[in-house]
Design a protein with these regions (language model features):
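Positively charged n-region of N-terminal signal peptides that target proteins for export
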Residues: 1-5
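Sec-dependent N-terminal signal peptides
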Residues: 6-13
Length: 171
């Protein structure tokens, strides 16, 4: 009889533990720290490379297991870290993006402008395959904008209006 109760109690505990497991986040949600690479030279001054790939959005990217910060959050985090490093003399944004939401593109535009004003660092934009709409707009504070000969760029149609002129046409 005691064995019967033991089996029932063990089964209940296993089921309860299976339903109330602690949430363990295996993958980090926070962005990685900035990594430094010495490509050439021995000087102390640095150039920061920030890639802008994909849709510019302020929504976190959700995967099957974890979510990663949005592109805007990642870039703002890198810019904030760069403001603390006085050895960064220039920031190179490598862009391959079709643009994105108006607000997200405008946030990056203002973050880049504020960084440039606070630090005096040079801002360089390198446009790769695609830099249209919001990606083009966020590039405007740059000191230098370079586009590959095959880059598709422009198309800043960030606000689209469709006026209704039916009443006007009837007159």
């Amino acid at each position: 009889m005691k064995r019967h109760y033991f089996i029932i109690l063990t089964t209940i505990l296993v089921l309860i533990m299976g339903c109330a497991t602690p949430r363990i986040n295996i993958f980090s949600v926070t962005p990685d720290p900035l990594k430094e690479y010495t490509l050439e030279g021995t000087g102390a001054d640095k150039i920061l490379l920030i890639p802008i790939y994909g849709l510019i959005s302020d929504n976190p990217k959700k995967g099957l297991i974890t979510a990663t910060p949005s592109l805007v959050e990642q870039v703002v985090s890198q810019i904030n870290k760069a403001q603390k490093d006085k050895q960064i003399k220039a920031v190179l944004f490598k862009i391959n993006s079709p643009g994105g939401t108006i607000t997200a593109s405008d946030l990056l535009y203002h973050e880049i402008s504020a960084y440039k004003e606070k630090t005096g660092s040079k801002i360089v934009i390198s446009m790769m395959d695609l830099a249209t709409s919001g990606a083009y707009y966020m590039s405007l504070p740059a000191d230098i904008i370079m586009a590959h000969p095959t880059t598709i760029t422009g198309s800043v149609g960030v606000i689209s209006l469709q006026p209704k002129v039916k009443g006007l046409m009837d007159k």
